[in-house]
Each structure stands twice: as C-alpha cells, then as structure tokens.
Amino acid sequence: MPEGAGRPWNLTELEEEKLKTMWSYLFKLFGITLLERTESWYTVKTHLSDDSSSSSSHRLSSVSYAKSRTRLELTSSSHGSDTRSFNDKTKNVHLERVEKIASEWDPEGLRVCFWDAVNCDDPDGLLLRFLRARKWNVEAALEMFMKTVHWRSREMNVGEIVCNADHLDKDDDFVRQLRIGKCFIFGEDKHNRPVCYIRARLHKVGDVSPESVERLTVWVMETARLILKPPIETATVVFDMTDFSMSNMDYGPLKFMIKCFEAHYPECLGECIVHKAPWLFQGVWSIIKSWLDPVVVSKVKFTRNYRDLQQYINPDNILKEFGGPNPWRYTYPEPCQNEAEALKNVEARKSLRAKKDAIAKQYEEVTMDWILNNGDMAEVKQKRRKLASQLIDAYWNLDKYIRARSVYDRMGLIAPQTSHTLLLSQPTNGDVKESMVEVTSSAT
C-alpha cells in the first residue's frame, strides 16, 4: 500500500464504506442501533469482501441487534433514496468470536473501554490501523480490535500501567530499567518518526521479572502514541546490538514485543533498525524471522556504522554513541515532588471524563449521519473532523488526572498539541482531493 493510503485523509470510496461498516458493528456492540437515529428504517451501503482473497461482496443493512443470537444478523429494508446495495446477493456475517469477547462487558462498559483505547488518537485513524492490518477484511479487523480491547483492559490493564508508571513503588524492576536507560525515545528519523532505542546489552536474562519487562514495553508504546505528531502515525525502533552476547538474548520479551506490534499496535512500526549486530546474531535472526509477518520482515534494516545509519536518520539526530555529532545522553530525571497530585483529584477526573464522554456521544451521533448519508456529506464530514479534534483536546485536558508524569514529561517531550491539522478526503471520480482544515486546540 502506498505511503499515506488508507488514512483518514486519503480513503477510496470502498475503503470509506468498510470503515462505515466497522463503525456500524461497533455501535451494535455498544447497544446503539442506527434505528434510534430516526423512526424510519435505513439501509447502510457497505462492501464486506476482502478484495485480496475473494470476489464475493456482501451487503450490510440496519436492524435491531439481538443479544441472544449467536451472530449479528443484518437484514435489508428500504427507505427512498437512502436504500443502496452493491449487488443482489446478501449474506449474514458470522461474528461469534467477536460476540463472545464482547459478552465480557455490558454494552456501555464496552463503549467506555473503546473510548479509553482511542486515547489521544483520531477514532477513525485507530480503526483504520486494524482494517489495513487485515487487508480491509472488516470481520477480521473487528475481531482483532476486540481482542485488543480485551487485552488492554483484562490482561495488561494498560490504564493502570500508565497511571502509575515510574511512581509504582512496588515494581522496582520497572523503575530500575528506566534508570539505566534500557530503552528510550529520542529524536526523529528521516520521515519525522520518533525513534525508540533499545540497548540490548543492558538486558540480562533473569535480572528483572518478565512481568516488569512486559509492563515497560507497553508503557513505552503508549508513551510513543503521545509523542507522535499528526499526520505521523508510526515510530522507528533501533536495536543497539553493541557489545551484545548470548547472555543478553531473551526470547520471551522479544516474542511479547512482536505480539504487541502485530496484534495490538498494528501499523505502528515504521522501520526496525538492527545496529552493529555481531556474527552470532545471524542464528538468532533466522529464528526471529520465522516468527514475523513478511510485512514486518520487510521493515527490518541492518546497519553497521554511522554511515549506514545516515540512510535512515539525519546526522543531527544521530547520537555520539553511534558515531554521530549529537551530544545528547540519556539520563533519568527522578519524579518531581507533588507531580502526581492531579492523580488524586477524583472530582476533577470525573468532571473531565464526563466532558470527554459528551463529545464522544456527539461524535457518535454525527458518525451515524455519516453512515446513513443523512444531510450534506461535506458538512457532516467537517463536523466529524472537528469533533475528532475536540476529543483529542478533551483527552489532553484529562491527561494529568489519569496518567502519571514520566521521564518524557520531565524532559518536555510530551505536551498537548496546540492545533491539529486535519485532512478531509473527498473522492471525486475515483481520485482523492485533499483539503487542509486547521482546528485550534483548547487543551491546556
């Protein structure tokens, strides 16, 4: 897929329809039926087939959602010019696995988990990551996304990780890894993507608990989301293999990281640079390569020296320890006194969550108009983009009440975006015309 394709600002008509379909399913899982939007019945235009593997197409239409069924049954009806279909063949779409995951929550609880997962992202942008990762197969993308919601809330408890971070006194291993700089984020690559460095030599098997390594991995990935500057959506990882030996090789954490990128943070990896790998790493790489998706393998680059690194990172962003001119060195600033006070302010947190949720509900309402083609579509899309920007603002207003300040806050690398440049895609005769819309943020 070309760079920038399949993003909120650059969708084909078919891709937009698949995004609408995914939203439609999510609404049903949230207990929101499209029929609540009006007293009439509507048919939603969609195309569910995975073009890369099947030529058959399917049609999705609105009906009430029955929890007792073992599938989402979607049947057609008509309402004037709103009735549309791609072909004459309709088919029920089996989503038993998705419904099984969703059954762990009541509909409103699932909706809350969804918006927590959106975090500071554009909601469309987040869903599109999963659609691209599953080659626009809506059913597969929805299952992947629901597994991620389960993983975030029931397995890893991501909210608790970011809420405590290096203030988590009981997890000394977590803080120890931050202090030594086992991994850190610094600078950008040539595509303006943030770069995360992992110093393999600083990891010793058994030195810290596997759980703390997993927590650190998730924390870094969540932190990178906050550092990304739209429209940049991916980050680059540099594995610094300087002085690497087999005592540093730990397959468990590596498998966990791969799982995170491939299953829960799809389309987040820009490039993976393996720097100064010794000859003994060849055997290790042959094993690791067999675990990776071919798309991920294509993103892995090997460098030996400063000259090689310059292919991917501009010289002014290459640190002295890699032969570059930049003198910056990682040091760990300890937590500041009283910097976690906002986390104790329950009333402020409740109030700001309520404000964010009110905007989310407005976004859902306008999204239903978009799905059903209600009103002037240019105006509806504009409203959605503005509300998406307001959701980002609302997240940043809430941020200090739900996320512990981190080393990157103390360094000044994490700060609310003061404005968001949004791209609205308008397909015309198969071509995408991009228009820039700047929305000023009110986040403080």
From Swiss-Prot:
InterPro entries: CRAL-TRIO_dom, CRAL-TRIO_dom_sf, CRAL/TRIO_N_dom, CRAL/TRIO_N_dom_sf, PITP/CRAL-TRIO
Protein name: CRAL-TRIO domain-containing protein C3H8.02
Positions where Phosphothreonine occurs in the chain: 43, 418
Keyword set, alphabetical order: Phosphoprotein
Organism: Schizosaccharomyces pombe (strain 972 / ATCC 24843)
GO cellular component terms, semicolon-separated: cytoplasm
Entry's Gene Ontology BP terms: intermembrane phospholipid transfer; phospholipid transport
Residues bearing the modification Phosphoserine: 40, 81
Domain CRAL-TRIO stretches: 171-330
SMART domains to which the protein is assigned, alphabetical: CRAL_TRIO_N (SM01100), SEC14 (SM00516)
Record-level Gene Ontology MF annotations: phosphatidylinositol transfer activity
